[in-house]
């Protein structure tokens, strides 16, 4: 996989229709993926609460307020860390800026490939929007600017079924990891990059992030797709 995998991440906002002045607020990160030929956005479920799914807004590209459209949404049942996933099925068809080409492919082979990086010190990276750098909502120009940050990381350990810890390699540049919730975890190999999971929580003080692995994500998307097909 090429470095396009890094550009699969997007900032996540919610829209406040009753607010006359401030229409959007940032909630974290999301990332775009391709599963069996359909497009999805993956989020950390806790970033959605207490808002309604129809309030969620994900920009097609940084710098604009053109948002992805979606129809179905899904979340697993349960309160464990492995259930902290929220998925949207995207219905946007116009491929402006080739966002289709930046989607992270979620395949059964990716699970096996990523798992080989799940050893102490295994090479990982996180792509998301921690809220530093250039971040602005310009209501007069109707633009949203957020800066994506990619941080290198190393695998630490497994904490639960499909849930793991990684340690970000950063020297206190990022003071809060909350914005990375919903960001894409990537396994780095000499041959290229492989989707490895989704960030759920993190602590900048310890430089640790907790993430759900790509196998758990694959199972969630498989469940979601089956329910949509049966609808």
Descriptions of predicted regions:
Residues 129-178, 182:
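A mid-sequence, solvent-exposed acidic-amphipathic segment
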Residues 2-72, 86, 91, 152-158, ...:
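Catalytic histidine site
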Residues 49-61, 82, 95-101, 137-151:
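Extended, non-catalytic subsegments within catalytic or DNA/protein-binding/adaptor domains
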Residues 68-104:
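A basic- and aromatic-enriched beta-loop-alpha substructure that forms the phosphate/nucleotide-
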């Amino acid at each position: 996989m090429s470095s396009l995998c890094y550009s699969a991440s997007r900032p996540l906002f919610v829209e406040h229709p009753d607010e006359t002045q401030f229409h959007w607020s940032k909630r974290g990160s999301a990332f775009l993926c391709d599963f069996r030929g359909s497009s999805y956005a993956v989020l950390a479920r806790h970033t959605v609460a207490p808002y309604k799914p129809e309030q969620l807004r994900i920009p097609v590209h940084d710098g604009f307020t053109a948002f992805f459209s979606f129809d179905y949404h899904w979340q697993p049942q349960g309160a464990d860390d492995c259930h902290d996933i929220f998925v949207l099925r995207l219905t946007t068809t116009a491929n402006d800026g080739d966002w289709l080409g930046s989607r992270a492919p979620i395949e059964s082979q990716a699970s096996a490939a990523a798992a080989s990086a799940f050893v102490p010190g295994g090479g990982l990276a996180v792509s998301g929007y921690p809220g530093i750098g250039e971040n602005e909502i310009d209501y007069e120009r109707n633009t949203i600017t957020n800066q994506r940050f990619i941080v290198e990381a190393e695998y630490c350990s497994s904490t639960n079924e499909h849930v793991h810890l990684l340690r970000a390699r950063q020297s206190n540049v990022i003071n809060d990891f909350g914005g990375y919730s919903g960001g894409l975890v990537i396994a780095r190999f000499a041959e290229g990059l492989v989707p490895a999971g989704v960030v759920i929580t993190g602590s900048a003080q310890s430089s640790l992030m907790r993430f759900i692995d790509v196998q758990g994500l694959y199972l969630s998307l498989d469940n979601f797709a089956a329910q949509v097909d049966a609808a």
